[in-house]
Amino acid sequence: MELAELNDRGLVLVGCGRMGGALLKGWLARGLAPEAVRVIDPNAPAWLAERGVATEGPLPDDPAVLVLAVKPQMMGGVLTERAAAGQGDTLVLSVAAGVTLAAYERAFPDAAIVRAMPNTPAAIGQGISAIVGNARAGAAEMALAETLMAAV
């Protein structure tokens, strides 16, 4: 799946710090429409509004992807708050270190889940990432996760 194909269902990004921001900039540069993105971050950077990325308002009903890009110590609260967004056909993609697939599966019991571990240069678009999926993450979900992580 190409990033432009996500424009119909949307992408929700929870956390837009260094890594989340680097990912989003890469996705936008590769064809993801700003209006297809909804960022959830209490300290959303100003450049989001400048590029037309929403930080307020309702979430898409059935986003194609829910990306979790918060620090591991914040993940417990995020999983509780965002469990409804990771249902149906939504791919849950996490770039947080130290949180197991089992923890994500408790929050999103029916979801395809992929954990990605980008290295530090990914924050400036020069990195590589390792990815691993749960049993529900088939070839299509893994390919989508790989496409998303290739942006950095």
PLM region descriptions:
Residues 1-57, 61:
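NAD(P)+-binding Rossmann beta1-loop-alpha1 motif at the extreme N-terminus of oxidoreductases
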Residues 5-7, 31-32, 82-88, 107-108:
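Short, conserved loop/helix-junction motifs that constitute active-site signature segments
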Residues 40, 115-130:
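Active-site capping/gating segments
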Residues 43, 47, 57-86, 91:
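Rossmann-like NAD(P)-binding element
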Residues 85, 103-112, 128-152:
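Internal alpha-helical scaffold of NAD(P)-dependent oxidoreductase catalytic cores
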